Amino acid sequence: MQPQPHISPNTATAAISAALESQRSRKNRGSYNCGRCGQPKKGHVCLLTAPPDIPTTPIASEPVSCISAAASSSRSTVLSLTAAPSSRQTFTHLRRALSFDDVDARNSLDESDLDAASMDLDLQLDTDIVQPGRFHAVGLWEVLKRLPPSSLLMAARVCKGWRETSRKMWKAAEELRIRVPERAQIGYIGSLLQKCPRLIRLSLKIESDFDATTLACIAFSCPNLEVLEITTSGAAVNRISGDELSRFVANKRGLTSLKMEGCSNLGGFSLSSSSLSTLWLSDLHSLSKMIFNCPNLTEISLEFSRQEDDSTDLVTMVDGLGRTCTRLQNIHIASLKLSHTVVLSLTAVNFRYLRMLSLVLGINITDASVAAISSGYKNLELLDLSGSSITDTGLGMICDVLPDTLSKLLVALCPNITSSGIQFATAQLPLLELMDCGMTVSDPNSDNPTFVENPSPHKTPGYNQKMFIKHKRLKKLSLWGCSSLDALFLNCPELMDLNLNLCSNLHPESLVLQCPKLQLVYASGCQGLLTGAIRKQVSENFSAGENHMPRKRLADASKRIQALPSLYQETREDGIYAGKRRKLEKEMCTIIH
């Protein structure tokens, strides 16, 4: 597939505005020239047929969809409309509740697939009526599909051809992402949704208060909806109750994914759906009941408010999940009420397919809880116990049970873990690719670690800790807030992302980075000289990885081969080519400070 040129929404909007002004100043009488050969229409009979690559009745592959930021191309234009894959290529890149990898899905649809699928939907676009600008319908479609909805509405006012094209584009849309401004009325959402009868995926970012009227509008306008995501911004309040949410889920029998923020007013709910597979609810507080009758649910993420007066019974909730949602693979629970009792209830249920477990902010989760998890779930790929009270002993239990499966371990905000435990975990987990140890090796007397320009050489011995990590597969390492760390040695050939934010006691002369693939380093709040030391070592790693052996062409000048220094004297021409090649192959590392 040839890369499509990026057309900025601002540029396209400006062009549309200019076209509108020209339309007001003169009357559009249509085109006087033939749309195929360019000759005057008067007395003209065109003998040319439409070229095969620009059909007279173009285009749109299967329904046009709005690609989300996680699955878009290098353009990150919000709410842009792009062509959807054909039915032979289905892309379901739903971000997992417990996935900490950046999703970089690309649309791999090539032009042949696009042409083959273009006949499935007859848009009846006539190239002769596309005015002004005299675009072919194919070119107009390529321009309009890059516009956000607001600009697409403006484009419909240019002329009849543009209005018909934009109308058919709305009609074919499968996915839509909308930012609802603070002053917008409920009719704003309804007017947009009524234009998209084929809509399957909907994402709303709401900046004002909303209630069940929004759900009713969505249910009425989107009969085929499968994925719904509602996020809040600013001071927006979600006033949807638990009964209203339960009614919506029960009526939308095709709904497979529901993600909603600001669920502080639910009070309690009973969700019943045979199709729902992904459920994210955040800002939950004091729920009187939580009933899940969703046999196909595979992923659940429940985040509770960080208030001490939360009265939600997590033990009863976990028991209910075990009875009705036996297919769960990913579980994420963030609550201050997490305790060892909840963990025991979770292990007693024994989810057979569980692969990712995240229990965050559970200060009452101890090494005994780790022992229960290790005995009940021996195939975990991700384990997140951030904010717990586990120690190095708990890390040892994890390493003993999960060395063959665990690839992601997150133990941030665990003050009882030391650098020795972290080193032991990296040595005993050969498949580890991501590790988050933020705020573990930190100074307990400093709640707010700050930058220290001239640290004192005389520190309390217990607070100065050193860390030596050697790992063949580790790709991401986070040591943010480890203010007691004064020496760091990393030998990780696959490491690409390193977070050293607020490592204020880390000395430049005590930092060794043997990471040739390092691409991104965070060093905010560190010593001033540390950034220079990082940049120097990364540069040296790249230089060490380059091949400085001279090369020589064969007798027929067809191929370059390595030659021994004693047998070959490098010429100026070879040096120029080698320098260009090294310049192209060299990768840059970004340091954020």
Curated annotation (Swiss-Prot):
Q: Mind telling me which InterPro entries this protein's record contains? A: F-box-like_dom_sf, F-box_dom, F-box_LRR-repeat, Leu-rich_rpt_Cys-con_subtyp, LRR_dom_sf
Specify whether Signal is a keyword of the entry. Answer: no
- Tissue localization of expression: Expressed in developing pollen.
Where, subcellularly, is it found?
Nucleus
Q: In which pathway does it act?
A: Protein modification; protein ubiquitination
Q: What happens when the gene is disrupted?
A: Stabilization of KRP6 and inhibition of germ cell cycle progression leading to male sterility.
In residue terms, where are the LRR repeats? 178-206, 207-232, 237-262, 276-304, 335-361, 362-387, 414-439, 477-502, 503-525
Give one Pfam hit by family name.
F-box
SS bonds (residue pairs)? none
One GO CC annotation, please? nucleus
Superkingdom is Eukaryota
Q: What does this protein do?
A: Essential protein for male fertility. Component of the SCF(ASK-cullin-F-box) E3 ubiquitin ligase complex SCF(FBL17), which mediates the ubiquitination and subsequent proteasomal degradation of target proteins. Enables the switch in cell cycle control leading to male germ cell lineage formation from microspores after meiosis. Targets CDKA-1 inhibitors the degradation specifically in male germ cells (e.g. KRP6 and KRP7) and thus enables CDKA-1 activation and germ cell S-phase progression. Promotes twin sperm cell production and double fertilization.
Q: Quaternary form?
A: Part of a SCF (ASK-cullin-F-box) protein ligase complex. Interacts with SKP1A/ASK1, KRP4, KRP6 and KRP7.
- Domain topic, free-text comment: The F-box is necessary for the interaction with ASK proteins.
Recorded protein name is F-box/LRR-repeat protein 17
The species this protein belongs to is Arabidopsis thaliana
Native organism taxonomy: Eukaryota, Viridiplantae, Streptophyta, Embryophyta, Tracheophyta
- Gene name on record? FBL17
